[in-house]
Amino acid sequence: LTLYLNAQEVVTMMTIGDQPDLLALGYLVNQNMLKIGDEVTAVDYDEDLGVVVVRTGHKTNFEEKMKKKVRTSGCAQGTIFGDVIDAFETIKLPSNTKLKTSWLYELTKAINTEPSLYLKAGAIHGCVLCEGEQPLVYMEDVGRHNAVDKVAGWMFQNKIDPSNKMFYTTGRLTSEMV
């Protein structure tokens, strides 16, 4: 799937092909190319060409982001662009955050028993976004980072506040996913 932001080609991703709009939006959000509150005027997908175009109402700073690349710890030696790493130190988990191990056990059980592509075919990673013990959305893809991006795209599209949310993934977290 080749992703364009306005008229600029950004990246080509290997994916299972479902939810191309959410994958595109999430990738752009996670690369700080789209920010919460930015206006997306259209997301156009051409299945035959394997292309998704995200159109925004503002000029993007894609060229500036391309000047600064960071090689990541993922198996495929991925790359993140621009100021993504710079924001790490500003992210803090509130001291009153609670996470119950029983929630993790229930999530693992649900992921391993719910009908999914993983149960049918294997070799698929899944991510679930929860509020407390309640799952909100579950996404799968051949790449862990793609499943993460789909969840981020879903959150962006549905204007979901990340406060009080828990994120669970079936695979290890690489630096770009964090």
What annotation goes with each model-predicted range?
Residues 123-158:
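Protease-associated
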Residues 144-178:
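Feature captures the catalytic cores and cofactor-binding loops of soluble hydro-lyases/lyases
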Residues 1-126, 130-131, 137-138:
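Intrinsically disordered, low-complexity regions enriched in acidic/Ser/Thr/Pro/Gln residues
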